[in-house]
């Protein structure tokens, strides 16, 4: 069936192609432009407005930006249905258009894959997001590549824009794509200064220098902390050493003082001992010894000889009278002092008086043996050399000593006749 250049088959194929591009339940506006009828979709504008609102909300939610955008793009375009749907009757009213001379706005893309076509959202048409949406870039060396990836993901998250059905839209879409591309370049340059042109090379170098300076500053601070710790440790050790030295010095000073005091006391004691030994040496007659041990031996022998002489002198009865008649003079004793001591009977030393019966029973005590007397005289002659009276007393005969022994002996030697007086004064002899 042909009517004024109508081709049902061509119009049918054109309508099917249009219907394959247009989604179901799409509102179409008929416009007359340059002598041709142009289709303008009304639902596409509504969809773009909804997409703008979705894009604004997705900019606020940066964490779920990709997932929400992909879900919106899939929901807006359901899969194509059967091309032979009987409800589509619009193909009978657009047969005047020549299929060979189609406008550029109605070029149909061949369906290469079952995937639905992607529609580019105009980022420029939406209002600019607030400055709080995108945080300022953090200049870190390790995150430079991640920043580039984020910009690439942001660039590729916006789906590509194909030519719409309206003839006035392609120029706007191209402008929007170019503007979005420029914007992504600016963001990429801000995030990655090293990837800029030769004029931006100095900024990259300064960025690297800043990082090196920061690292060197950290190293310097750590070194300073270590030096401070070491300095404090050294000061503490020095103070401890000084304290130990002071304690040692005080202890050594105390020890030295104690040693000096001990030495002084020892010297004084030795001087006193030497003085006493000299005095003892002067008291012992005929003592020519110099050492202390020999001087002490001489003093002991001298005291023994004196004790023996005293015993011999007081064992005889006549020794006391002889001593009274001719007192024995010791060195250093004045005669007047000795006589004064004899006259006072209280100050006389008292010796034990030997019993006469004991003397008669033991004649050896009276030294009646001349040989024994000779031994005694020879033994202590050197000590009695300075005392002539004592030497003469020791050389007396035993009979002479017995003569002065006791008054009982003398009474026995007297005559038995003793004159007596009577009452009338006459004298009687018995």
Swiss-Prot record:
Induction data: By UV treatment. Down-regulated by ethylene (ACC) and auxin (IAA), but up-regulated by salt (NaCl), cold and heat. Follows a free-running robust circadian rhythm, with higher levels during the light phase. Rapidly induced by light in etiolated plants. Sixfold induction by both red and far-red light. Accumulates in response to warm temperatures (e.g. 27 degrees Celsius) via PTAC12/HMR/PAP5-mediated stabilization in the light.
Composition bias, Pro residues: 126-136
Functional note: Transcription factor acting negatively in the phytochrome B signaling pathway. May regulate the expression of a subset of genes involved in cell expansion by binding to the G-box motif. Activated by CRY1 and CRY2 in response to low blue light (LBL) by direct binding at chromatin on E-box variant 5'-CA[CT]GTG-3' to stimulate specific gene expression to adapt global physiology (e.g. hypocotyl elongation in low blue light).
The species this protein was found in: Arabidopsis thaliana (Mouse-ear cress)
InterPro entries: bHLH_dom, HLH_DNA-bd_sf, PIF1-like_bHLH, PIF3-like
Gene name as annotated: PIF4
CDD domains, alphabetized: bHLH_AtPIF_like (cd11445)
GO molecular function: DNA binding; DNA-binding transcription factor activity; promoter-specific chromatin binding; protein dimerization activity
A Pfam family per the record: HLH
Protein family: Belongs to the bHLH protein family.
Keywords: DNA-binding, Nucleus, Phytochrome signaling pathway, Stress response, Transcription, Transcription regulation
Bias (Polar residues) ranges: 61-71, 160-175
First-listed, main subcellular location of the protein, grouped into a coarse class: nucleus
Tissues showing expression: Mainly expressed in leaves, stems and seedlings, and, to a lower extent, in fruits, flowers and roots.
Ranges of residues in domain bHLH: 257-306
Subcellular location field: Nucleus
Protein name from the UniProt record: Transcription factor PIF4
Low complexity bias: start-end ranges: 244-253, 405-419
GO annotation, cellular component aspect: nucleus
Subunit-structure text: Interacts preferentially with the Pfr form of phytochrome B (phyB). Binds DNA as a homodimer, but once bound to DNA, loses its capacity to interact with phyB. Interacts with APRR1/TOC1 and PIF3. Binds to RGL2 and RGA. Forms non-functional heterodimer with HFR1. Interacts with PHYB, CRY1 and CRY2 in the nucleus in response to low blue light (LBL). Interacts with FYPP1 and FYPP3. Associates to PTAC12/HMR/PAP5, which acts as a transcriptional coactivator to trigger the thermoresponsive growth-relevant genes and promote warm-temperature-dependent PIF4 accumulation. Interacts with MED14.
Effect of residue 231 to D: In strain: cv. Bla-6, cv. Et-0, cv. Li-5:3, cv. Mt-0, cv. Pa-2 and cv. Tsu-1
GO biological process: de-etiolation; phototropism; positive regulation of thermomorphogenesis; red light signaling pathway; red or far-red light signaling pathway; red, far-red light phototransduction; regulation of auxin biosynthetic process; regulation of auxin mediated signaling pathway
Deleted gene: phenotype: Reduced responses to warm temperature (e.g. 27 degrees Celsius), including thermoresponsive growth-relevant genes expression and hypocotyl growth; this phenotype is stronger in the doule mutant lacking both PIF4 and PTAC12/HMR/PAP5.
């Amino acid at each position: 069936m042909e009517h004024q250049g109508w081709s049902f088959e061509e119009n049918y194929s054109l309508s099917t192609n249009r219907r394959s591009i247009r989604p179901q339940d799409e509102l179409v506006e008929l416009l007359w432009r340059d002598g041709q009828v142009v289709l303008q979709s009304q639902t596409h504008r509504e969809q773009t407005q909804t997409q703008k609102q979705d894009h604004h909300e997705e900019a606020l939610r940066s964490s779920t930006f990709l997932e929400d955008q992909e879900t919106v793009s899939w929901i807006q375009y359901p899969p194509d249905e059967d091309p032979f749907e009987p409800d589509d009757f619009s193909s009978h009213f657009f047969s005047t258009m020549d299929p060979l001379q189609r406008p550029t706005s109605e070029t149909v893309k061949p369906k290469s894959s079952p995937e639905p076509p992607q529609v580019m959202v105009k980022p420029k048409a939406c209002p600019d997001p607030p400055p709080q949406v995108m945080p300022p870039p953090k200049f870190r060396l390790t995150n430079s590549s991640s920043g580039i990836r984020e910009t690439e993901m942001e660039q590729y998250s916006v789906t590509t824009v194909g030519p719409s059905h309206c003839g006035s839209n392609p120029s706007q879409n191209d402008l929007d794509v170019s503007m979005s591309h420029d914007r992504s370049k600016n963001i990429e340059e801000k995030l990655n200064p090293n990837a800029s042109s030769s004029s931006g090379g100095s900024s990259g170098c300064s960025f690297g220098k800043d990082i090196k300076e920061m690292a060197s500053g950290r190293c310097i601070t750590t070194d300073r902390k270590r030096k401070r710790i070491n300095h404090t440790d050294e000061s503490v050790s020095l103070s401890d050493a000084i304290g130990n030295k002071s304690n040692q010095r005080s202890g050594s000073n105390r020890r030295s003082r104690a040693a000096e005091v001990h030495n002084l006391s020892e010297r004084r004691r030795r001087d006193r001992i030497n003085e006493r030994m000299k005095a003892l040496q002067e008291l012992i007659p005929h003592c020519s010894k110099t050492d202390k041990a020999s001087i002490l031996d001489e003093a002991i022998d001298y005291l023994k000889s004196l004790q023996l002489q005293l015993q011999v002198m007081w064992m005889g009865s006549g020794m006391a009278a002889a001593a009274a008649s001719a007192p024995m003079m010791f060195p250093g004793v004045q005669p007047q002092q000795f006589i004064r001591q004899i006259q006072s009977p209280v100050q006389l030393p008292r010796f034990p008086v030997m019993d006469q019966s004991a003397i008669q029973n033991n004649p050896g005590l009276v030294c009646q043996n001349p040989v024994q007397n000779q031994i005694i005289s020879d033994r202590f002659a050197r000590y009695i050399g300075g005392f002539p009276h004592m030497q003469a007393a020791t050389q007396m005969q035993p009979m002479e000593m017995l003569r002065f022994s006791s008054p009982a002996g003398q009474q026995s030697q007297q005559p038995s006749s003793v004159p007596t007086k009577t009452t009338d004064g006459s004298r009687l002899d018995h």
